[in-house]
Amino acid sequence: MSQTEIEIATQPDCWQQAMALARQPDGPAAASLPRPGERVAVVGCGTSWFIAQAYAALRESGGHGETDAFPASEMPAGRAYDRVVALTRSGTTTEVLELLRRLRGHTPTTAVTAVPQSPVTGPADAMVLLDFADETSVIQTRFATTELVLLRAHLGEDLGHLPRQGHSALDEPLPAGVLEAEQFTFLGQGWAYGIAQEAALKMREAAGAWTEAYPVMEYRHGPISVTGPGRVAWWFGDPAALPSGLADDIARTGGQLVALGRDPLSGLVVVHRLAAALASARGMDPDNPRHLTRSVILA
């Protein structure tokens, strides 16, 4: 078993710890994460950007305050926010550090990271540490899902079902036919679109797979043209919530629809397993993905 697969398997336990951390009335999450009504920007790079998108959609749709998500390198200069939240596993990503330095003394900032005493502790005003979810793998799995569990729990979501679903996602067989598929299109709605994007990235990173991701209502506006025999359209959501007629449209292409009907975050665990399995089937090493390092540190 690869180190990546070992870390994938620990996710439900990490989620339990994140929920407990979010519930601490005097803990770092309560003290440092956005308060109701604050106008917030959430930033990150790679996986962290997609988790930022999911959190931003959840926070704003839940009535907690206007929330935007940006890649750290693309946050608009001069836009007013009450707080900026930076998601960074290693705390060393160049673009995140540069942004936090620019904001220092102007906008309150909070970093969510896995590494104590990392460089991000300097320019960030506050920090939430998830060291129990840190990873040695290059590819993020458990840290990304754990930070989103923390953020969701801080918003007041009841996530008691999630660890059970996570264990099921680890134990159940992969959907039939997916290991043989040549292409994957991941679909989500609302916050699950960020999860769809992260799923597509995991498959590219680990297995070099051809993957795409779209908001589900955009799928008919062109992307459905790549679906066909031997290709998968993967819906992160309740099968009953799939837009009317879309399952029939996918069937007419000859493609396979996967709709697992669980919380999108536990659905992402299934994709983690698929990515690692597909990498092995293709003779690739998920612990050593091509052209990637644990953190992007620019000279």
Give, region by region, the residue ranges found by the protein language model.
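Glycine-rich phosphate-binding loops that contact phosphosugars or nucleotide phosphates
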Residues: P34-R164, L170-D171, Q189, A233-G261, ...
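Conserved phosphate/anionic-ligand binding catalytic regions in large, soluble enzymes, centered on
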Residues: M1, F50, A54-Y55, E198, ...
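Active-site phosphate/pyrophosphate-binding segments
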Residues: I6-G37, A126-W234, A241-L242, G283-A299
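Short amphipathic alpha-helical interaction segments
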Residues: E7, D238-L242, R262-V270
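Phosphate-moiety recognition in structured ligand-binding domains
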Residues: A124, D248-A299
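A generic structural motif
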Residues: P71, W210-E218, Q256-P264
